[in-house]
Amino acid sequence: MRGFVYVLVCVLALASFSRAQLPGGGGPVLPGGGPTIGPVNPDPTRTEVCAKFWVQEGNSCYLFDSGAFLRQVAASRPVVVNNENGLFQAAANMYCGQMHPNASLVTVNSLAENNFLYEWAVRMMVEPEPVWIGLHAGPMGQWQWYSGEPVTYTNWERMTAPMAEPGLGAMIFDADIIAQMFNNQVEITPQWVPEQAINDRHALICEYHPSGMTAAAAAATNAPTFPPMATAPPMAATTRGPVMFQNNPRNLVNSLTGGRFGGSLLHEIPRRQRMRPSNYRKNPYFGIQP
């Protein structure tokens, strides 16, 4: 009888875990569920004017790139990855210029644009990926965009903007660990975080304005798109909540027991600036090291 009860409990736990992996899933046993990003409604009136691999939104074309510097030595040879960890911020900006004339690291002018970048990029991520934007500390001790546009909007992680110390740049999609017993998660936020631009390599988002479109028109055209309808919904942008990446396919309690300290194999991991785990790319549990 005891064995039957044990099997029944295991089956119920497995069913709950499977349900938690589905969008909108989750429950009292295994909290979590899918990302909170909503569905995409196609707009048949859209016409694309951007270069290949670039995505148009409003008056801008965007490119999400790993910064791995993919290149082909010869036609008969495979593609070579020069840098799998991304690029420093200044190099990332130069890379954008190589991808398209007049392109630079993205300039974020509004909350609506920030929300679009967040939803668009996170949908393509398999694992958390910090991304450079174009904001960086200028020589006069002020934040400035690589595009040369004025800084009219910011979305820093803290209430006040950090000091524009030399060597700092802004990144987006920082990852924080949400430790849970059954289902560890990584939270990706749409806020900006200062980072050492010459010490840290990240992916990047490039931006350019197609011919005939200027940055001055960004506020008027860089709004979310909606399918045709009699009355459009309110256009007021709302701040996006964090997306939760569900990572652990197994039960941590069963896979990490038997250690010296209270029967656990977990131990502390050195963390980088802002308490992000130094090995979250390599460690399958993102927050613990067996």
UniProtKB/Swiss-Prot annotation:
User: Which keywords, in A-to-Z order, does the entry hold?
Assistant: Glycoprotein, Signal
Give the positions annotated as glycosylation sites.
102
UniProt domain C-type lectin: residue ranges:
92-162
State whether keyword Nucleotide-binding applies.
Answer: no
MF-aspect GO terms: carbohydrate binding; pattern recognition receptor activity
Name the Gene3D superfamilies on file.
Mannose-Binding Protein A, subunit A
Expressed, tissue-wise, as follows:
Accumulates exclusively in mineralized tissues.
The record's section on InterPro entries has: C-type_lectin-like, C-type_lectin-like/link_sf, CTDL_fold, DC-SIGN_domain-containing
Signal sequence, renumbered to the chain: 1-20
Pfam families per the UniProt record, alphabetical: Lectin_C
A single BP term in Gene Ontology:
immune response
| Any one Gene Ontology cellular component term annotated for this protein | external side of plasma membrane
What's this protein's function? Matrix protein of the sea urchin embryo spicule. The function of the matrix proteins is to direct crystal growth in certain orientations and inhibit growth in others.
What protein is this chain from?
Answer: 30 kDa spicule matrix protein alpha
Gene name, per UniProt, is: SM30A
